[in-house]
A protein has these predicted regions:
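Helix-loop-strand module that forms the ligand-binding subsite of alpha/beta enzymes
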Residues: 1-67
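Glycine-rich phosphate/pyrophosphate-binding loop and the adjoining helix
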Residues: 69-124
Length: 124
């Protein structure tokens, strides 16, 4: 469940410079389960690679006590990276960016662990 996870990687497309409505709805619906956890974004879209969508949702994350990390993987013109078999094939640069994102997310997750422990003690 969301409550049991320590960090999240949100993957979102960009619709008119905003994230997917389903992402915003999930964030709002599970309000109490997000607190004191790190979050990262992999976004995709046209020329911006979905970066506007990721930036637009970050204020909501902070209101929910999620910590969005600065690293992000933005995949521009993503349809060019889908093979005939339907498999997504990232560029080498995108794969390296994803590795860096996950490493940084792990650091933030560890740094926020004391806050999660304190919050669970306060609730229990």
């Amino acid at each position: 469940t969301v409550a049991r996870a320590d960090a999240f990687v949100f993957v979102t497309p960009e619709y008119n410079a905003f994230p997917a409505p389903s992402l915003v709805n999930a964030l709002d619906h599970l309000y109490h389960e997000w607190g004191h956890k790190a979050a990262a974004f992999v976004s995709y879209g046209g020329s911006s690679g979905g970066m506007r969508a990721a930036q637009a949702v970050k204020p909501l994350l902070t209101a929910l006590q999620l910590m969005p990390i600065p690293q992000q993987v933005a995949i521009a013109s993503f349809t060019r990276l889908i093979g005939e078999d339907g498999t997504f094939r990232p560029t080498d640069a995108q794969a390296r960016a994803a590795d860096r994102l996950l490493a940084e997310l792990a650091r933030w997750t560890a740094a926020l662990a004391p806050l999660r422990r304190a919050a669970s003690t306060d609730e229990g």
